[in-house]
UniProtKB/Swiss-Prot annotation, chains A, B:
It comes from Lachnoclostridium phytofermentans (strain ATCC 700394 / DSM 18823 / ISDg) (Clostridium phytofermentans). Its main location: cytoplasm. One of its GO terms (molecular function) is xanthine phosphoribosyltransferase activity. 5-phospho-alpha-D-ribose 1-diphosphate binds at residues 128-132. Belongs to the purine/pyrimidine phosphoribosyltransferase family. Xpt subfamily. SUPFAM superfamilies: PRTase-like. Signal peptide: none annotated. Homodimer. Xanthine binds at residues 20, 27, 156. It is found in: Cytoplasm. The keyword Cytoplasm applies. This is Xanthine phosphoribosyltransferase. The lineage of its organism: Bacteria, Bacillati, Bacillota, Clostridia, Lachnospirales. Pathway: Purine metabolism; XMP biosynthesis via salvage pathway; XMP from xanthine: step 1/1.
């Protein structure tokens, strides 16, 4: 998605350790106009999948998922990072390791909101090692629903998550795949760039 | 807002301890169509305030704030619950006590995203004791920006938050104010009900 790549080049900040900061437009301050364009693009890419529900994970996926959901006319469900699982039995639960925060979360979705008949589109802002996505896929499978697609705003193509998910045979679309970045001169190379 | 009150009566669940669960349409599963109507109503209520930015706090406020922001054509900034404040100097920070989770969070907003010229509308799903809101107001004041309004979806009118905020002279609008609820028969009494 050219608009997104242009914006990453303009306002993204490359930091040491392969960190790409997009907090001025995507995950701290949010440019709603840009995210609407992202919503239209996901609609185009997943139009045929007869999506009934959009699933994401708190926190930074929620706003994107809500804007995207308008183009599919379906509800959003966001998985919660649980303090403790004391609602056993009423929820689907999984564990997700966060490398950013160096801890493991219990992540839950109420059984009321994922049903075997649901055709789920998973939406998230970033895909790196894929831990969060694998956890979300696990929640959907637990419910008997199907993962009909995964829409990612920015994929770090040099990490393994994208490959893991694609090898599962899931329809994954990333609107910008970063193949490399350089913290010294701030440049970003996207997959498909000449 | 009648549509919202009707929905709370229909799908809200009253639990012991003055807990009102609205997780089927507002803060776990999200009914985007309803939230669009909420957005239109906030636009009507705060139309004159020349809002330049919407501020909320993760996690459940984010989706609502993003949908609402579309009616104001402004960006959303969400305050983050910090793991630790190791970015001192670059952020406005405050502490917010959560009674639900029985802990105190450091809450931060990057200094890049709140400027003295900003006219801020704060959006959140619930107002009870007001701790989260007072923290967000504190962040805005730290930045030199002005709080032009606060839009709340559901206020627990029998808790002190609403009174505290209104006594500050801030333009607070709650779309549904619950004056009492009864866990035994599941009834909810809204302010203004006959």
């Amino acid at each position: 998605m050219q608009l997104l790549k242009d914006r990453i080049r303009k306002d993204g900040i490359v930091k040491q350790g392969n960190v790409l900061k997009v907090d001025s437009f995507l995950n701290h301050q949010m440019d709603i106009e840009l995210i609407n364009e992202i919503g239209k693009e996901f609609k185009r890419l997943f139009e045929k999948e007869k999506i009934t529900k959009i699933l994401t994970i708190e926190a930074s996926g929620i706003g994107i998922a809500c804007i995207v959901a308008q183009y599919f006319n379906v509800p959003v469900v966001f998985a919660k990072k649980a303090q403790s699982i004391n609602i056993e039995g009423e929820v689907f639960a999984t564990k997700i390791e966060s490398f950013t925060h160096k801890k493991t979360y219990d992540v839950i979705v109420s059984k009321k909101f994922l049903k075997p008949s649901d055709r789920v589109l998973i939406i998230d802002d970033f895909l790196a090692n894929g831990c969060a996505l694998v956890g979300l896929i696990d929640l959907v499978i637990s419910s008997g629903a199907s993962v009909e697609g995964i829409g990612i705003v920015i994929e770090k193509g040099f990490q393994s998550g994208g490959e893991i998910i694609r090898e599962m045979g899931i329809h994954l679309e990333s609107l910008a795949i970063v193949d490399s970045m350089n913290a010294e001169d701030g440049t970003v190379v996207f997959r498909g760039d000449k």
